[in-house]
Amino acid sequence: MPDLLVRSFAPLLLAFQPCFTQPSFRSFWALAGAWILCSGRRSLTRIIQSGDLSQFKHFCSFHRFFSQARWNLDDLGRCVFHLLLPFCSPILIGAVDDTLARKSGRHIWGAAMHHDPLRSSKIRPVFSFGHSWVVLSVHLSFSFAPNKVWAIPILVRLYRKQKAKLAPGRNGKLERKQTGHATAQQYRTRPELALEMIRTVANWVPERKLRILGDSEYAGGSISRHLPANVELISRMVMGAALFEPAPTKPSRLGRPRKKGKRLANPAQMADNSKLRWTKTTLRLYGRSVKVWYKSIDVLWYSSAGQRLLRIVVVRDPRGHRRDDCFFSTDLTMTPSEILTTFSWRWPLEVCFRDVKQLLGFEDPQNRVSSATQRTAPFIFYIYDLVLLWYAQSGHRLAQQSLLQRLWYPQKATVSFEDMLRTLRHATWQERIFSDPALDAHTRKLLKPFVEWAKAMA
């Protein structure tokens, strides 16, 4: 197998060997190294070319690795999950969210028009053609950056729109073929896909508590009413939600027992009620200290969570820069401050989406086959995970050698994924070039500037 990367990266790749047959594992090993070292557009043919993989296998073997080989994405996610457990706290923190990978072309399998949050505004929604991926990640901090939270994707699902009966285009022709759209029997919503992944992770560690973070799309009954016993949900609540007291324990009359008590004020009314005093505090949210006011109460949100009691927290920005908001947790042991602080851990997943798109070419592969489409993009998330794990285990010791000095950014104090990727590439180039004992001192001196230039371009 080609040793494209630094030797300290090999144990991480070997951990995935049980997930593959021997030929597929050799392809996985080669593709992982070539993908990390590749720069520019990352189509599969360019990955093969940049790693010179045609010297190792026929190029068709790497296409078949995604379209025909026998391996399962969830097995890779489980391997990553077990590699992460030594870094995790006793209570696991996870998050679910979706991201859009924009595509172009009539024959892209599973692509459709989806809402594009990056191009949309509050007034004008924008839709883009592409794939919508639902991702479940584990969130944690590493010892080399204890104040920073990282999102590690472990499970990924492709959301497929339901096949439309009619899709007219110009002059009565279809503008795009409906390739890979789900039938009525195959169709599942994004929350249903998220619940499937939550149950999978909960079954991997039934003895551990798992707290799942999600935005308002994942706060509905599709998830909150069907959570496994060891899973708690922290999410955002609409300000107009209908809230109720718990049902009385003793029925006051004959007939069916009540499922909910009397109607309470909704979160918007709670925020405007001057008789309920705000609790004022300062919390560490999104990497900085923020002053917040909040009101908290335990209620039923029957339309979403049924008879499960929730702890809701209505939040106000005392500076008036943000509108009032409301969050809830199914875990009644959490304080309001813990709920708000923990929910802020959801943001690193958005940073992860940005990194895989801009630094690893998440939107670049163009697939026309079902299995290749559902494997190639998630494969990039696992490349992201491997780089993070390598840096946490050994790469952080090499950070000073690979540090890129920016005169316009002297206050930089935390490491980014871009820094990790540069460190891995720099360590690889140094090992591959300078590990040759035949090189004399003069040749090493000549080659050193080229490695530094390559580091600056990485």
Describe every region a protein language model picked out.
Residues 38, 100-102, 215-220:
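Gly/Ser/Thr-rich loops at beta-strand to alpha-helix junctions
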Residues 1-67:
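Gly/serine-rich nucleotide phosphate-binding loop at the start of the catalytic core
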Residues 27, 39-43, 57-61, 71, ...:
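Generic alpha-helix structural propensity
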Residues 52-56, 98, 215:
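Short, surface-exposed loop/strand segments
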Residues 37, 52, 66, 70, ...:
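Short gly/ser-rich anion-binding loops that grip negatively charged ligand groups
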Residues 1-16, 20, 51, 92, ...:
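Single, function-defining residue in the core of a domain
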Residues 68-165, 296-300:
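Active-site-proximal, Lys/Arg-enriched surface segment
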